[in-house]
UniProtKB/Swiss-Prot annotation:
This is RING-H2 finger protein ATL33. One of its GO terms (biological process) is protein ubiquitination. Belongs to the RING-type zinc finger family. ATL subfamily. Keywords: Membrane, Metal-binding, Transferase, Transmembrane, Transmembrane helix, Ubl conjugation pathway, Zinc, Zinc-finger.
Length: 235
């Protein structure tokens, strides 16, 4: 039983005035404690909740991949635009200037080079290939058709560089290229016109058409070894 006496301390939210009990009442909140008739309790409500912590950034794996790609792609794009662009343009300008200068020089070379005619093509020294005699001096392969020389093959030797080829191969080559297929030595039209066609028979002798002089293949081989001009072209 409670009496009619009440006690209050201040006012405000969360403050509850409890009437003073008339008798001793045991409490269950605090074991071993009793409430007497002169006790007064003020019950304070729960404190206000703490503010919620800031939410962390929730990144899914797909969003994380996009973020990484953006961090890598943006610097690469900036580098390509501001650093690589001027270098590539300067390289293009230099290459175009070199191309224009080479194109300016090319017409002079084309004009100065005389056309290759049938007369100049067939005016080199030629003859039949003999393996035992010519394999060491002129080789065993035609550099135009890449075929191996065989005995009795009709060969033609350039007087400037002493390289030998099949007659048909070198004639076809010289119609389009004014140089040797191996060493790129320019074939002089004047020297070709002056050098007569020298047939070589199987026995190794060189016969001059229009003359009685015979030059042996042995002396010709000696000229090759010593670096002297071909003996057949001295007449």
């Amino acid at each position: 039983m409670f009496n009619n006496t009440t006690t209050s301390f201040g006012s405000g939210p969360g403050i509850v005035v409890v009437p003073t009990p008339a008798t001793t009442v045991p409490t269950t909140d605090f074991p071993g404690t009793t409430i007497t008739s002169n006790s007064t309790f003020i019950i304070i409500g729960p404190p206000p909740p703490f503010p919620a912590p800031p939410r962390s950034i929730d990144l899914t794996p797909l969003k994380l991949i996009f973020v990484v790609i953006a961090f890598v792609a943006v610097p690469a794009l900036v580098y390509a635009l501001f650093f690589n662009g001027p270098c590539s343009s300067s390289r293009r300008n230099s290459s175009s200037s070199r191309t224009s200068s080479s194109s300016d020089d090319t017409p002079h070379a084309t004009v100065d080079t005389p056309p290759i005619t049938e007369t100049t093509v067939t005016s080199e020294s030629g003859g039949k290939f003999h393996k035992d005699t010519h394999s060491k001096e002129i080789g065993n392969e035609c550099s135009v058709c890449l075929m191996v020389f065989t005995d009795s093959d009709e060969l033609r030797q350039l007087s400037e560089c002493k390289h030998a080829f099949h007659v048909l191969c070198i004639e076809t080559w010289l119609k389009d290229h004014p140089n040797c297929p191996i060493c790129r030595t320019d074939v002089s039209v004047k020297q070709q016109t002056e050098a007569p066609n020298v047939p070589v028979n199987v026995n190794g002798n060189v016969n001059r058409s229009g003359g009685n002089r015979r030059v042996s293949a042995t002396s010709r081989d000696d000229d090759w070894r010593q670096g002297l001009p071909d003996a057949s072209s001295l007449v």
